[in-house]
Amino acid sequence: MRIAILGGTYNPVHIGHMFLAKELEHFLNVDKILFIPTHKPVHKRVENISVKDRIAMLKLAVQHEKNMFIDECDIVNGGITYTVDTIACIKNKYVHDDIYLVIGDDLFESFDSWKNPEKIVESVNLVVVHRIYSERLISRFKHTYIDNRIFPISSSEIRHRIEQGLPVDYLLPFDVLRYIKNNNLYVKGK
């Protein structure tokens, strides 16, 4: 089986994440896509939202997708999340499968500063997608580039729009938007 893994905070998951997953199905011909929410990312703060809420939103986003699943290995392990450890966890579950680690070009730019990058590229197929740059970045690490569309939205922009009372309709899966509204998530002062 061919499995793509997409790690992130998903704070919140939005249509850019879902659109990328669909493009990965097409370009990589994967059988399964695993969304892996991080517990405590190394280079990012997750503010004012519980792990429970982030997972609930992810479940709502993938509920009608037959090839998309959530793996909570980083949540279960707790603490700071390193990709090399996440990969070890996934490879223990999917011993005989081809694993594709998908990262954005914004992260790939600093990939050599990650914990054990050599071990990562030895363990999985590294796939880079466009998030910021339209041109391909050069690296000493073996990787594959996907010529995906850059989707000009981010979770931080969505949080900001909600705090400011601006519309976010159609930027989020409908059930995720409803969950955010029903639980007053990302509202300023909360």
Swiss-Prot record:
It catalyses: nicotinate beta-D-ribonucleotide + ATP + H(+) = deamido-NAD(+) + diphosphate. It is an enzyme of class 2 (transferase). One of its GO terms (biological process) is NAD biosynthetic process. It comes from the Bacteria. Keywords: ATP-binding, NAD, Nucleotide-binding, Nucleotidyltransferase, Pyridine nucleotide biosynthesis, Transferase. Gene3D superfamilies: HUPs. Signal peptide: none annotated. Coiled coil: none annotated. Pathway: Cofactor biosynthesis; NAD(+) biosynthesis; deamido-NAD(+) from nicotinate D-ribonucleotide: step 1/1. HAMAP family: NaMN_adenylyltr (MF_00244). Catalyzes the reversible adenylation of nicotinate mononucleotide (NaMN) to nicotinic acid adenine dinucleotide (NaAD). NCBIfam families: cyt_tran_rel, nicotinate (nicotinamide) nucleotide adenylyltransferase, PRK00071.1-3. This is Probable nicotinate-nucleotide adenylyltransferase. It comes from Borrelia hermsii (strain HS1 / DAH). The gene is nadD.
